[in-house]
């Protein structure tokens, strides 16, 4: 049995999120949540919400036992960038790209 949760358009770069995702890949649920809870990174809070959503999906949709679940796969894909402008000297402007990503978590036995 596999259960998925996806967060699309998370307002953080994929590169920063992958650092957190690599830490919990393959871990049991309880241990993964502990790692995410005590991590100081912004991405940890976002990934934790996605993992908790996947746990809720497993309980509600599949009636699964949470204690047996582990993070079967987690991957982070780059999403579209938000284009913004910032003012520069002499009336000029530079483009800023605010990165977004898609986070996909799959839980299984």
UniProtKB/Swiss-Prot annotation:
Keywords: Ribonucleoprotein, Ribosomal protein, RNA-binding, rRNA-binding. InterPro entries: Ribosomal_uL22, Ribosomal_uL22_bac/chlpt-type, Ribosomal_uL22_bac/org-type, Ribosomal_uL22_CS, Ribosomal_uL22_sf. One of its GO terms (biological process) is translation. Disulfide bonds: none annotated. One of its GO terms (cellular component) is cytosolic large ribosomal subunit. GO terms for molecular function: rRNA binding; structural constituent of ribosome. Signal peptide: none annotated. Part of the 50S ribosomal subunit. Belongs to the universal ribosomal protein uL22 family. PANTHER family: CHLOROPLAST 50S RIBOSOMAL PROTEIN L22-RELATED, LARGE RIBOSOMAL SUBUNIT PROTEIN UL22M. This protein binds specifically to 23S rRNA; its binding is stimulated by other ribosomal proteins, e.g. L4, L17, and L20. It is important during the early stages of 50S assembly. It makes multiple contacts with different domains of the 23S rRNA in the assembled 50S subunit and ribosome. The globular domain of the protein is located near the polypeptide exit tunnel on the outside of the subunit, while an extended beta-hairpin is found that lines the wall of the exit tunnel in the center of the 70S ribosome. This is Large ribosomal subunit protein uL22. It comes from Cupriavidus necator (strain ATCC 17699 / DSM 428 / KCTC 22496 / NCIMB 10442 / H16 / Stanier 337) (Ralstonia eutropha). The lineage of its organism: Bacteria, Pseudomonadati, Pseudomonadota, Betaproteobacteria, Burkholderiales. The gene is rplV.
């Amino acid at each position: 049995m596999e259960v998925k949760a996806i967060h699309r358009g998370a307002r953080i770069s994929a590169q920063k999120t992958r650092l957190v995702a690599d830490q919990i890949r393959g871990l049991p649920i309880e241990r993964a949540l502990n790692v995410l809870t005590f991590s100081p990174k912004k991405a940890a809070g976002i990934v934790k919400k996605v993992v908790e959503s996947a746990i809720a999906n497993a309980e509600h949709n599949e009636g699964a036992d949470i204690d047996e679940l582990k993070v079967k796969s987690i991957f982070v894909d780059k999403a579209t960038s938000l284009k913004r402008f910032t003012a520069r000297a002499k009336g000029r402007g530079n483009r800023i790209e605010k990165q977004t990503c898609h986070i996909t978590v799959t839980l299984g036995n």
